[in-house]
């Protein structure tokens, strides 16, 4: 534990007893904290309780009590505290300061509140409204202080503004509508026309649409023509209300309203004009309506009558009762059904005084059958598209299978792009297809190879037995299997390491491979020792010749693989490897050396049974081999030393 002196300066004035007791906390051997307020043992206990609440310091830390002045070192009276000490004094002082700051912020916010500026504006508005008693009657219009200036200057604008304000408020809520009625009743009592106003409100729902449109026309004329005063409108409204009370069914009242609205009216007071302008505004009609309002209302009435008529319902039932299958069978049925529907529409239009133009009828006749034809053609197209899509799927699958060997061969030839080989070497792809067809169909190959074996056996039955033939076939497999492995290893070594020559090897890749298969097939036939035209008379020499043929055939294939062009190596197809029979030993699982070999080397000729025999049976009859291996081996043996 580190005990250090207090780093405080002595007080300038006063006794050192003022700062008599202090605590020094040694935290992490470097930080020292003072607590000048803890002067008693009771203070230490209270401090202990405080620290127990918050659990801040470790048990290894200690509290040092000093009872001397600053100039002296602290005494050795230590009290171990089993907790960690926080800055108790600093905490208390910070708490007091935070409380003071909060109080100061509250006092600062009060005089500078934002709503004070708005309150002054609002008070000024209230003073203006108090000066105008009109708006005291209408407290809802207090949010329009600009209307006061216009209303004092123009009485017409005053009435318009009042009516517009009332319509807006009536649409917002039902309370505003009730307040309008109360205020309107006050105006009507002042003018003495309250009875007419109540009658007009009772008859608002009974006004037909034609008369409403006439009233709206007058309002539009009043807005467009400044010469027309609201008195003329009020006269027409008053007379119309009287006529409606007498006879609502007569249509001549509309004409009388028009005639009376043209005449001048001079006897009505200003209060009555206000009342009548409010009557028009009370009926929730817009102020501005187009001059074609009569035509729209008449057309709406005709449509309502048409919907209510019995002919319309009968026509719907007739159209629904028809079988939907009749419309889909033939185009002639569609034409008949369309003509029937058009006749029904014409009858309905004659009854309801509606006219259809000849152009519309021609368009209906043209459109209806064409739509049915389009639907049928769309169905046919959808079916044909499904068939085509199924064909394309099968074709794409077959093409992808056929193009696999070509892409693999290109990788071995020298990393040439797939597009060039597919465009230029069309024949190369066909030959690889021939190989894939043989490798995919193992059963067909085995059947073909059985026929070839039967032919070869018929040639060899005169000199050899059936046992000798099976042994010779097994030996041929071994002779053919081991050189294939060497070819594949060398081709794998040559293909990645050979540098790309831009002109020579790409031309060798792009050349068609249709001509070389003839020569290579002749060489492969000589190597594989298949065409045996001549029988052998001395079977004793076969064992020696067999050993020579194995060694020479290995050398031949090594030198031939070096002399072959690059285009003859790639046919080692990885796609053909998993299709080999399972029982073949790992040495014979090799890939074919060239794509030009006949069917027998690709893999279906020998079954798993004969291959298992090749593992199990020893070479008992080494001398009794078939005559296939001799002529090829002799010929190759003579050629080799000259090439080397």
From Swiss-Prot:
Basic and acidic residues bias (residue ranges): 159-174, 192-204, 236-249, 256-279, 544-558
Biased composition (Polar residues): 175-191, 216-233, 607-630
Annotated Acidic residues bias: 292-301, 310-338, 447-476
Region of interest: Disordered: 123-644
Ranges of biased composition (kind: Low complexity): 133-155, 367-400, 496-531, 585-594
Name the UniProt record assigns to this protein: Uncharacterized protein R627
Species for this entry: Acanthamoeba polyphaga mimivirus
């Amino acid at each position: 534990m580190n005990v250090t002196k207090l780093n405080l300066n002595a007080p300038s004035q006063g006794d050192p007893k003022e700062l008599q007791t202090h605590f020094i906390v040694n935290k992490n051997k470097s930080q020292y904290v003072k607590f000048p307020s803890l002067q008693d043992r009771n203070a230490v206990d209270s401090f202990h309780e405080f620290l127990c609440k918050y659990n801040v310091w470790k048990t290894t830390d200690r509290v040092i009590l000093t009872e001397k002045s600053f100039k002296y070192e602290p005494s050795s009276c230590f009290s171990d505290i089993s907790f960690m000490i926080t800055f108790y004094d600093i905490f208390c002082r910070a708490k007091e300061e935070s409380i003071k700051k909060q109080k100061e912020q509250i006092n600062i916010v009060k005089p500078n509140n934002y709503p004070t500026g708005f309150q002054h504006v609002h008070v000024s508005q209230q003073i203006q409204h108090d000066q105008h008693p009109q708006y005291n009657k209408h407290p809802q219009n207090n949010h329009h202080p600009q209307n006061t200036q216009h209303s004092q200057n123009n009485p017409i604008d005053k009435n318009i503004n009042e009516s517009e304000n009332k319509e807006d408020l009536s649409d917002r809520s039902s309370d505003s509508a009730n307040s309008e009625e109360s205020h309107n009743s006050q105006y009507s009592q002042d003018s003495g026309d309250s009875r007419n106003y109540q009658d007009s409100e009772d008859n608002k729902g009974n006004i037909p649409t034609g008369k409403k449109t006439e009233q709206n026309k007058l309002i539009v004329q009043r807005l467009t023509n400044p010469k027309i005063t609201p008195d003329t409108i009020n006269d027409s409204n008053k007379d119309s209300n009287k006529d409606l009370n007498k006879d609502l069914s007569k249509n001549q009242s509309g004409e009388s309203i028009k005639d009376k609205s043209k005449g001048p009216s001079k006897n009505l007071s200003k209060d009555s004009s206000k009342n009548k302008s409010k009557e028009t505004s009370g009926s929730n009609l817009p102020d501005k309506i187009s001059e074609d309002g009569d035509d729209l209302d008449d057309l709406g009435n005709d449509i309502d009558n048409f919907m209510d008529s019995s002919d319309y319902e009968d026509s719907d039932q007739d159209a629904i009762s028809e079988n939907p299958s009749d419309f889909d069978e033939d185009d002639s049925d569609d034409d008949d059904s369309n003509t029937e529907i058009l006749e029904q529409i014409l009858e309905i239009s004659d009854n309801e005084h509606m006219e259809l133009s000849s152009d519309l009828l021609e368009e209906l006749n043209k459109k209806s059958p064409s739509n049915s034809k389009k639907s049928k053609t769309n169905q046919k197209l959808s079916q044909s598209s499904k068939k085509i899509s199924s064909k394309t799927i099968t074709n794409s699958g077959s093409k992808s299978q056929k193009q696999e060997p070509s892409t693999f061969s290109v990788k071995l030839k020298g990393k040439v792009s797939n597009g060039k080989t597919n465009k230029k070497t069309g024949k190369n792809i066909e030959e690889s297809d021939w190989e894939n067809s043989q490798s995919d169909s193992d059963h067909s190959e085995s059947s073909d190879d059985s026929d070839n074996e039967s032919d070869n056996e018929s040639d060899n039955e005169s000199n050899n037995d059936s046992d000798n033939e099976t042994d010779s076939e097994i030996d041929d497999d071994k002779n053919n299997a081991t050189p294939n492995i060497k070819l594949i290893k060398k081709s794998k070594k040559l293909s990645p390491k050979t540098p790309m020559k831009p002109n020579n090897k790409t031309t060798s890749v792009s050349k068609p491979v249709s001509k070389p298969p003839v020569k290579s097939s002749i060489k492969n036939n000589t190597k594989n020792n298949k065409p045996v035209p001549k029988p052998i008379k001395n079977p004793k020499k076969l064992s020696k010749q067999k050993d020579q043929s194995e060694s020479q055939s290995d050398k031949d294939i090594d030198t031939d693989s070096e002399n072959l062009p690059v285009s003859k190596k790639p046919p080692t197809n990885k796609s053909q490897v998993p299709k080999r029979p399972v029982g073949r030993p790992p040495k014979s699982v090799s890939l074919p050396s060239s794509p030009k070999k006949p069917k027998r080397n690709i893999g279906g000729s020998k079954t798993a049974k004969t291959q298992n025999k090749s593992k199990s049976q020893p070479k008992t009859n080494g001398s009794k081999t078939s005559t296939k291996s001799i002529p090829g081996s002799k010929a190759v043996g003579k050629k080799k030393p000259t090439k080397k």
